[in-house]
Structures are given as structure tokens and as C-alpha cells.
Amino acid sequence: MVPWRRSSSSSSAPSSRPARRPARTNARVSPDVSSELSPLAGEEGAGEERWSALVPDLLADILRCVEAGSERWPPRRDVVACASVCRRWRDVAVAVVQPPLESGKITFPSSLKQPGPRDAPMQCFIKRNKKNSTFFLYLGLTQELTDDEKFLLAARRCRRGLHKEYAITINSDGLFHGSQSCVGNLKSNFTGTKFTIRDWQPPYEGAKAFSSRSGRWFGNKHRCPLVSTGDVEVGEVSYKYSLLRPRGPRRMSCSVQCPVLKGTAVDPQDGKRLSNSIPSSLVLNSKVPSWHEHLQCWCLNFHGRVMVASVKNFQLIAPVEPGEPSDKTVVLQFGKIDDDVFTMDYRQPLSAFQAFAICLSNFGTKLA
């Protein structure tokens, strides 16, 4: 048996002592930069290519089946998930899904700025938090009207000098001015009798893609709004004050810019289709309530959607066509059903964004 011997320092065998670390070096290890893609990136690219390589007719049939089986939320988030697969799937989903004007459904974030349904009003409700001066708009899916309903928009009220301002956002966690999820605002005058609705993300040609840092997708936890491309006035709300009837119902008038949209749903990343729509100005006036002698109060027919008498309850009507009943011209109604819960029903030509902004102007004390 050969005895073990200590190797000399001049031996070619490696020493058992660890090599001394060079002085003043960075201990962090950097990956070797290579011109070739990593295997993981290659697999992701190949997977996306396989999804986009489906036959367009077959893909359209698949999305039609998914859309037909997802009539209401939350199952309708499957349609949004399909549109998020790749560009090809998004284009087909936009062609398959009808806008709220035709389908009566809200699917994509762009639906919030499209005209409401033509046949029946879109039933929503607003929850108010007096402590934080915040307001949340939900799509009414059940009669309970809880926070589990489909979230649409949120707003926060703050005072800037002598004016009050509401920041409207599509992210319930981004309720502050300057947030990337803000889509517009509502600003009042000193007396609170005149409000201006501004759209920070007007849908016109040149609107860019979503920002990945801007909140949540519509229907799950990955919603991203359009990149802000401007500041456009899209409406104005005025409250009239009468010296002869200081304790009468509020009288309000609203002038809004209503885009005329036809066809399929608008791709949130494509502003060209919205650029073809021609905005038209429309003046809406509050419906005059009737005096009820037995109840000794002013009354309006809300068709069971309002439960509590309040000075905030109102109905906005469009100009009446010859021979058309006045009940069919109500395009927006707002009413109180609890201390901090209000219903909001809107229809064509208003969008959810415009209707929400008009209802926000009704909160607070004003000389009207």
C-alpha cells in the first residue's frame, strides 16, 4: 500500500486551499450575453406562434362558442382571456363580440366609453364612502347589490382651491389624481352648479397600446387602460336655481358629446375604428316630477328601481320625437335605495363613463 504524502507547493496537483478572492471585485454573477435566445424564450415564442396559426374560421367558431356560453359576469371574463392570448385572437374577438349598443353587455374596457344599449337600459349601482369621499360604480348582476358585483369605475372627490374635482379611474386601488389608471375627471365651479366632464383618454386615431403598469385588466387582476393621449371636454352639467321655488326639485341640464358607433366592439389597442365615429352634441334635461297630493311630495316613476325619496333622484330625458311617448326618452335615471347606495340606469347615447360623471355631479351641497 502506497503511503499518503503531502504534495509540495511546486506540484502540479491543485491545492486544497480555496483561491483568494481578488480585491475590490463585484461578487454578483452576471449571465453570459448570447445572441441566441434562451430555450424558455424560444418555447414561449413557439407557443404563441402555434396559437396564432389556427385557421381564422376555426378560431372564430371557438370564440363564438365561448362568447355564447359567457352571457354574464363573472363567466364573461373567459372572453377577455381569449382576447389576451395574442394579436390574432384579439382581432377575432373584436370582430365576434358586439358593442354594448347592440349586445347590451360590457366586455372590454373600451365598452365603458361606448354608447349604452339601445333596447333596455344598463342597470348599475353606485356605492358611496363618505369617510374617504370615494364612489364605486358596479354592474348590477343580482338584486343584493353587494361589492361582489362587477366593478366598472371608481372616483374620488377632493377640493382644489375653490373648486371640487372628481378623479375617475378604472382601478379601485388608484384613487388619486395623476394615477396612470385615471380616465377622466369632473370639475365644478365655486357654487357647485356647473360641472365640466373631461376625458383624459379620448379614443381617436393615434391612441397607443396599454401600459403594463396601469392597474388591472377588465375582469381579472391585469387590467390596463389606454395611454393618456389628450384632454378633451366631453360634457357639461348645469343646475338651475329658481328664486320662486327654492324648495322645489332640482333642475339640471346636460350637454354631452355622444359618439356614433356601429358594428363590432372596438379593439382597446386600435384607435382607427373610433376615429371614424362622428361625435354629435346632445342636450338632456331633467324630467319634471309631478306633485302627489296624498303624499305631499314630488314623484317620478322609476319603475321600482328607487326606494328612498331624495333630492338627488332625477331622470334625464332626450328631446321627444313627434308621436313618441315621453317614458321611452329617459336615457339616464339615478335614485337612492339606501344611505350610501344609489342605482344608475343608462342607455344610448350615453356611455358608462359619461353617465357616472353626470351622477357624480349630483352629490354634495349646491345652490340648486
From Swiss-Prot:
Compositional bias of kind Low complexity: 1-17
Domain of life: Eukaryota
Pfam family, one: Tub
Tissues expressed in: Expressed in stems, leaves, flowers and seeds.
Residue span of region Disordered: 1-44
TM ranges: none
Domain F-box, first and last residues per copy: 49-104
Similarity comment text for this entry: Belongs to the TUB family.
Name of the protein: Tubby-like F-box protein 2
